[in-house]
Design a protein with these regions (language model features):
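Mid-to-C-terminal alpha-helical segments outside catalytic/metal-binding sites
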Residues: 2-23, 29-69, 96-104, 125-129, ...
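H/E-rich (His + Asp/Glu) clusters that bind or coordinate divalent metals
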Residues: 6, 179, 186-205, 217-332
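Hydrophobic faces of well-ordered beta-strands that scaffold small-molecule active sites
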Residues: 21-25, 70-72, 110-113, 139-141, ...
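Short, basic, glycine/proline-bearing loop/turn elements
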Residues: 40-47, 143-144, 250-257
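Acidic-and-aromatic substrate-binding clefts and catalytic sites of carbohydrate-active enzymes
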Residues: 48-53, 79-80, 117-123, 146-153, ...
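Short, conserved clusters of charged catalytic residues that mark active-site
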Residues: 53-57, 153, 157, 201-204, ...
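Active-site gating/metal-coordination segments in enzymes
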Residues: 68, 74-201
């Protein structure tokens, strides 16, 4: 896997990412930021602040590190602020503005649309609008909505729609409802996010949701969170489900795609490669929650650790196969 030469990824000082497609990139609209502030969410999930974001700064950052395309999504805590009508309108706002960014900057941005869950009828309508009218590249879903995880039968109509559309779904963690009892005062992205991702994916598998809907391509963040370590444990316990659907946990995990946002070396990536193969790996920055200097600092050792063919697949080859609109590189 490794190529540790000093010039493994080009000359010294060159952007480390060489045309990467970033599947884990976030954005804010003015309306979303105002809704968060009005709701008192100024330190989302215990982070220090709502990070700054604007298209010009994002593009400058992308050019500096070598990202060709950023697939934009709304991070935790999402858009569930205010009345159901307000949430529906906020979903339309972030999706409309995201689609406009894609149109205004061809090849530089993609859109993973937000849905006003847990309002299922409105979410079905917004998913159709985003995919059909706005040309969204996929849908961003959080691990749960008001405590209902994605394997819940509540979401079956949505999963059917996404399966029929062969949609790409980017899964993003959010704080579990019990976070006040479990986070121990630490920022929730440190411990709660990885375990909520693990919980959500396990539920998708153990409920049979993943197997019932093979047309959905799920992207799991942060190198699979705790799944590479817990996969065998979950698989054995699954055999004890007397009343659950028959599942093959390891086979189902092998169908997923995994982004490498965050701290993947030296331990997480080797563990993940015991669970899946390199053609299921995707690059993710988690910008702007991961600031620009940290994106570059994490990217350089990652790309230098990979053989050239694996590096190409990770940075853009696998993403081009996953997202139809991106199958051809952007014209210079």
């Amino acid at each position: 896997m490794t190529d540790n030469s000093a010039t493994a990824n080009g000359p010294a000082g060159a952007p480390p990412l060489h045309g990467a497609i970033d599947v884990h990139a976030h954005f804010f609209t003015a309306r979303l930021r105002a809704a968060m502030q009005d709701a008192g969410v100024t330190r989302p999930d215990g982070m220090p602040a709502i990070p700054d974001w604007d298209p010009k700064s994002a593009l400058r950052h992308m050019d500096e590190v070598g990202i060709e395309t950023a697939m934009l999504s709304v991070s935790s805590p999402g858009i569930d602020f205010g009345t159901p009508d307000a949430v529906r309108e906020l979903a339309r706002n972030v999706n409309d503005e995201g689609a406009e960014l894609v149109r205004t900057h061809p090849g530089r941005f993609g859109l993973m649309a937000s849905l006003p869950l847990p309002d299922l009828p409105a979410s079905l309508a917004e998913a159709e609008r985003a995919l059909d009218d706005l040309g969204a590249d996929g849908i961003a879903l959080h691990t749960h909505y008001q405590g209902h995880y994605l394997g819940d039968p509540l979401y079956e109509p949505l999963m059917e729609l996404l399966d029929d559309r062969r949609a790409v779904v980017f899964l993003h963690p959010t704080s579990p409802q019990c976070w006040k009892d479990t986070s121990l005062g630490y920022p929730r992205p440190m411990i709660e996010f990885p375990f909520d991702t693990t919980r959500a994916v396990a539920h998708l598998i153990l409920s049979g949701t993943l197997r019932r809907h093979p047309g959905i391509s799920f992207v799991i963040p942060h190198a699979g969170a705790a799944l590479p370590v817990l996969a065998d444990r979950i698989a054995v316990f699954a055999l004890m489900q007397a009343d659950g659907p028959p599942v093959d946990v390891l086979a189902d995990l092998a169908t997923l795609h995994f982004d490498l946002a965050g701290f993947t070396l030296p331990r997480a990536l080797p563990a993940l490669l015991n669970l899946t193969d390199t053609r299921h790996l995707l690059y993710g920055s988690d910008f702007p929650f991961t600031p620009d200097w940290a994106v570059e600092g994490l990217a350089r050792p990652l790309v230098d650790a990979l053989d050239p063919a694996v590096r190409t697949d990770l940075l853009h080859g696998n993403a081009r196969r996953l997202f139809p609109r991106l199958r051809e590189p952007r014209s210079a």
